[in-house]
Amino acid sequence: MSNDNTSVNEFDFQLVCEYFSSLERQGPGSPEMTSKALSFVESLTEAAHIADIGCGTGGQTMVLAEQTSGVITAIDLFPSFIELFNKKVEVKNLQDRVKGVVGSMDNLPFQNEELDLIWSEGAIYNIGFERGLKEWRRFLKTGGYIAVSEASWFTEERPAEIEDFWMNAYPEIDTISNKIAQMEKAGYVPVATFLFPETCWTELFYVPQMLAQETFLNKYVGNKAAEGLVAYQRYEAQLYAKYKEYYGYAFFIGKKISD
């Protein structure tokens, strides 16, 4: 597939949802990365209220639930993701403090200064890194933390093919240093930043898609939209293999220290 200025957001909503529902993770990441980011967050008690925004089916949320003792409210726009999320919660018997709710990240169901921690892995791009940081800040208590993972450039210059792909897919992609500056501008003190290893993209995201793609295509034989979605995901994986030294995911952890 060539870069024809298509982005995954342009595919059929229900098809995208069904495709990614079959995956443990809906973006690059790992339990180890979630745990590492959480290690920079201090003073979470049983009374803490955590929000996981753009939670998907909850791979990272279950890690948070295992390693914290507070209440977790997880938000996602896709009802089928939340259905799967809440089934995981039931299996783990966490219903007393973890719940998934269908909702939009630009209309969150929280009060000002209600949250001790805002979490968002591979999802803040849906609203935009800068906008999300600014708009979500009011929900955090003073002393609260925000932890988000975000696609970022590793270099100042890139080959045209990968530059064009990301400018179409997510124009707000930027360098690590610029992302940290944006976090500061939004009113946070940067606490930590670290890069994801390649395995978070390959073994834990693209490889699991291979089997899912075959199952998906067998279900939708002759469906051009389904074929196009799979072709796009395969193209994205090929680009990562070719240009991984130029970009990847990074975690950004910040703290709100004043109103």
Where are these regions (language model features)?
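A short glycine-rich, Lys/Arg-flanked "PGG" loop and its adjoining helix->strand segment in the class I
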Residues: 131-145
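Conserved alpha-helix/loop element of class I SAM-dependent methyltransferases that forms part
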Residues: 27-46
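Class I SAM-dependent methyltransferase SAM/SAH-binding core
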Residues: 51-53, 57-107
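Short, glycine-/aromatic-enriched active-site segment of Class I SAM-dependent methyltransferases
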Residues: 151-170
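Short alpha-helix
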Residues: 172-187
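A short SAM/SAH-binding and catalytic strip from SAM-dependent methyltransferases
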Residues: 117-130
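A short acidic, Gly/Pro-enriched loop at the edge of an enzyme's catalytic core
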Residues: 106-117
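Conserved Class I S-adenosyl-L-methionine
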Residues: 192-259
